[in-house]
Amino acid sequence: MALPQGLLTFRDVAIEFSQEEWKCLDPAQRTLYRDVMLENYRNLVSLDISSKCMLKTLSSTGQGNTEVIHTGTLHRQASHHIGEFCFHEIEKDIHGFEFQWKEDETNGHAAPMTEIKELAGSTGQHDQRHAGNKRIKDQLGSSFHLHLPEPHIFQSEGKIGNQVEKSINNASSVSTSQRICCRPKTHISNKYGNNSLHSSLLTQKWEVHMREKSFECIQSFKSFNCSSLLKKHQIIHLEEKQCKCDVCGKVFNQKRYLACHRRCHTGEKPYKCNECGKTFGHNSSLFIHKALHTGEKPYECEECDKVFSRKSHLERHKRIHTGEKPYKCKVCDEAFAYNSYLAKHTILHTGEKPYTCNECGKVFNRLSTLARHHRLHTGEKPYKCEECDKVFSRKSHLERHRRIHSGEKPYKCEECCKVFSRKSNLERHRRIHTGEKPYKCKVCDKAFQRDSHLAQHQRVHTGEKPYKCNECGKTFGQTSSLIIHRRLHTGEKPYKCNECGKTFSQMSSLVYHHRLHSGEKP
């Protein structure tokens, strides 16, 4: 990513200390300072961007109060095609800077020593290959003020980084009357007293200056403030190519996730419960299962104090209080609180019945309905009443039965305030007020309020008599007719007149008898 041409200094990445601050740093912190600044400088040198860097340090020469001022300036003027710049050849040319010493005859001190080197991406053939590109010039200047007897000429054997490292290493012996400054041109002091400093001062300042992230991943465009973090991040992209499931093609960013996923295909379940011996494919599933044995329910609802063994169950339960229904049907826009409810509802639109009974071949649109149907074949009745030990094949039947013992009748008619123990009885009762007769005979168009009444009526047309007396073999079309007939054999007369105490086997006979006492004539 090309940066705009201009001057880039150490301002955002350099650290500045006053003499009081520097005295508070221990040797380890000063060493850290030198390492950080050296690494920073090397990074800037290696970047192919237009930049100017100035490094200015102060150190004691050990010769009285004489001080040495090291000033390093790096000018780099980028070409128009910075991506084509050949830094490999520059690295070769960095060796051998010319040090020129000029003596100031007027004061007897050494005049500024300057090392100047023009660095081009290449010379000769390389310039021809990159015709049209401007030459890239690096000038590394350093000025020293020393009491020297005579001028000297040096030939540098090291690279830029080595020269800077030498300057920074000298910074550990700072004079008490001077300060260390890594700033370009302008001199800004930080006024901190000795009491305000602490051992983490260097670390805190470094974190502030390193907030600017300059290392960017070309794949995900994430930025990092040092190259080591970028390299660590790039491992993720490398593993993305390696962590792919051979069966379904699903990709994972870590190998351990891929290993867990493969158990879905192999059926491997390495995690076993010590209590019941049940095995699981994931350790997290085993952890959740163990809560069934311990009875632990650490997740409590703040609204109703109900507790749950799983956090996901608590989150799902909260929707009861909030009324949230995040799952919406795309066909009819009906919303549901749970994804499982939406899945069941969707089958109503498709008409799909994917669950088949292996015994009778009957199909169902829900797995729970198939499981309930299986109990008809097996005779299983897993739900038992604690009061009378009566058993039921469905939980809803047990709940309904319990109301017999408790006398609870939660369903109330809004018209007449009559109460019922079953919702179905309330719905049936409401038809008395509305006059609704939803069940219609296809033969004679006669309508009925109850489906059982329609079924009985249809036997008039078919002549079917499915109810047979075990005593005499007589058959009947309605079960009520069979019950009345059986009283002929048993002699049972359950209907009694309150006036004279006479009993009857049929209710209709008792009603007819009442007219004798009342004088009513039908």
UniProtKB/Swiss-Prot annotation:
Please tell me in which tissues this protein is expressed: Isoform 1 and isoform 2 are highly expressed in placenta, pancreas, and small intestine. Lower expression in colon, ovary, testis, prostate, thymus, spleen, kidney, and liver. No expression detected in heart and brain.
Q: Which UniProt keywords apply?
A: DNA-binding, Metal-binding, Nucleus, Repeat, Transcription, Transcription regulation, Zinc, Zinc-finger
User: Coiled-coil ranges per the record?
Assistant: none
Q: Where is the KRAB domain?
A: 8-80
| InterPro entries, per database record | KRAB, KRAB_dom_sf, Zinc_finger, Znf_C2H2_sf, Znf_C2H2_type
Domain of life according to the entry: Eukaryota
Predominant localisation class = nucleus
Return any one Pfam family short name: zf-C2H2
Q: Where are the zinc fingers (C2H2-type)?
A: 215-237, 243-265, 271-293, 299-321, 327-349, 355-377, 383-405, 411-433, 439-461, 467-489, 495-517
Write one Gene Ontology MF term.
Answer: DNA-binding transcription factor activity, RNA polymerase II-specific
Localization annotation? Nucleus
Q: Output one GO BP term.
A: regulation of transcription by RNA polymerase II
Q: Which GO terms describe its cellular component?
A: nucleus
Check the record and name the SUPFAM superfamilies matching this protein: beta-beta-alpha zinc fingers, KRAB domain (Kruppel-associated box)
Q: What job does this protein perform?
A: May be involved in transcriptional regulation.
Which protein family is it in? Answer: Belongs to the krueppel C2H2-type zinc-finger protein family.
Question: Under what name is this protein listed?
Answer: Zinc finger protein 468
Look up and give the organism this protein is from.
Homo sapiens (Human)
Q: Coding gene?
A: ZNF468
